[in-house]
Amino acid sequence: MKAFTQHTGLVCPLDRANVDTDQIIPKQFLKSIKRTGFGPNLFDEWRYLDVGQPNQDCSQRPLNKDFVLNFPRYQGASVLLARENFGCGSSREHAPWALEEYGFRAIIAPSFADIFYNNSFKNGLLPIVLKEEEVDELFQQAEATEGYQLTVDLAAQTVTRPDGKQYGFEVDAFRKHCLLNGLDDIGLTLQDAEAIKAFEVRHQQSQPWLFGAIK
């Protein structure tokens, strides 16, 4: 998993509340057994004018020019600004996969659905909860200023505006450690690989009957 320490990026303001995971990545794309390839289908039903299908060449599809992610000024955005209850709905992990693959590193909102919030940390995506009035301020600035960027510092737990004003945010210490060091569940387990191997050796020596061939 890619570590997150500090990131400065273009902000895309998605001014919609209660964005659910089916809107983030529609159900027809969940058939894939891989965790890659979802970026082109992020917000598929909003980004395109046709109905998307798995393995479709999205470069040939008609774009919805009224959707914010398609505005030329927000191309290359890596910080998503959202409204309350972002990521609600089903627990599909494909939602943070699609956001991360598109290029988003952080999402700022007044609140997140719990499962989406947890899944984001496990996939290198930083969900940041700010006060509603702070999010309102950021929406006003991002919509008024082309090329608007924010700097997110996970170690310091701050979001910094271009004018220098900072907002602090809370994050669980364990999640912070994992994201700073790029550790997902597998990475955490592999840190104890030698201890696991040693246990397996001791276990096989102390209870060899468990490892005998079945006749």
Swiss-Prot record:
Its EC number is 4.2.1.33. The keyword Lyase applies. It holds the Pfam family Aconitase_C. Pathway: Amino-acid biosynthesis; L-leucine biosynthesis; L-leucine from 3-methyl-2-oxobutanoate: step 2/4. SUPFAM superfamilies: LeuD/IlvD-like. GO terms for biological process: L-leucine biosynthetic process. Gene3D superfamilies: Aconitase, domain 4. It catalyses: (2R,3S)-3-isopropylmalate = (2S)-2-isopropylmalate. GO terms for cellular component: 3-isopropylmalate dehydratase complex. Transmembrane segments: none annotated. Coiled coil: none annotated. Keywords: Amino-acid biosynthesis, Branched-chain amino acid biosynthesis, Leucine biosynthesis, Lyase. The keyword Nucleotide-binding does not apply. GO terms for molecular function: 3-isopropylmalate dehydratase activity. Heterodimer of LeuC and LeuD. Belongs to the LeuD family. LeuD type 1 subfamily. Catalyzes the isomerization between 2-isopropylmalate and 3-isopropylmalate, via the formation of 2-isopropylmaleate. NCBIfam families: leuD (TIGR00171), PRK01641.1 (NF002458). HAMAP family: LeuD_type1 (MF_01031). This is 3-isopropylmalate dehydratase small subunit.
